[in-house]
Amino acid sequence: MAKKSGSGLQSSAGLMRYYEADKNAIHIQPKTVLIAGALVGIAVIFLSAVNGFWP
């Protein structure tokens, strides 16, 4: 069998770059997304009812 060369540093270097970029990203909690979606849904239903588009 062929012997693998290298110690896998390239794959771990890619992971380190990913985690460094992830620290700089904007983080939003899942609860915040659900609440925002519910509020938008309620607003759409309310505005549809007010403007006479309710079925």
Curated annotation (Swiss-Prot):
<keyword id="KW-1003">Cell membrane</keyword>
<dbReference type="InterPro" id="IPR016482">
    <property type="entry name" value="SecG/Sec61-beta/Sbh"/>
</dbReference>
<comment type="subunit">
    <text>Component of the protein translocase complex. Heterotrimer consisting of alpha (SecY), beta (SecG) and gamma (SecE) subunits. Can form oligomers of the heterotrimer.</text>
</comment>
<keyword id="KW-0653">Protein transport</keyword>
<feature type="topological domain" description="Extracellular">
    <location>
        <begin position="50"/>
        <end position="55"/>
    </location>
</feature>
<keyword id="KW-0472">Membrane</keyword>
<feature type="transmembrane region" description="Helical">
    <location>
        <begin position="30"/>
        <end position="49"/>
    </location>
</feature>
<keyword id="KW-0812">Transmembrane</keyword>
<keyword id="KW-1133">Transmembrane helix</keyword>
<keyword id="KW-0811">Translocation</keyword>
<feature type="topological domain" description="Cytoplasmic">
    <location>
        <begin position="1"/>
        <end position="29"/>
    </location>
</feature>
<protein>
    <recommendedName>
        <fullName>Preprotein translocase subunit SecG</fullName>
    </recommendedName>
</protein>
<comment type="similarity">
    <text>Belongs to the SEC61-beta family.</text>
</comment>
<dbReference type="GO" id="GO:0015031">
    <property type="term" value="P:protein transport"/>
</dbReference>
<keyword id="KW-0813">Transport</keyword>
<dbReference type="InterPro" id="IPR023531">
    <property type="entry name" value="Preprot_translocase_SecG"/>
</dbReference>
<dbReference type="GO" id="GO:0005886">
    <property type="term" value="C:plasma membrane"/>
</dbReference>
<dbReference type="Pfam" id="PF03911">
    <property type="entry name" value="Sec61_beta"/>
</dbReference>
<comment type="function">
    <text>Involved in protein export. The function of the beta subunit is unknown, but it may be involved in stabilization of the trimeric complex.</text>
</comment>
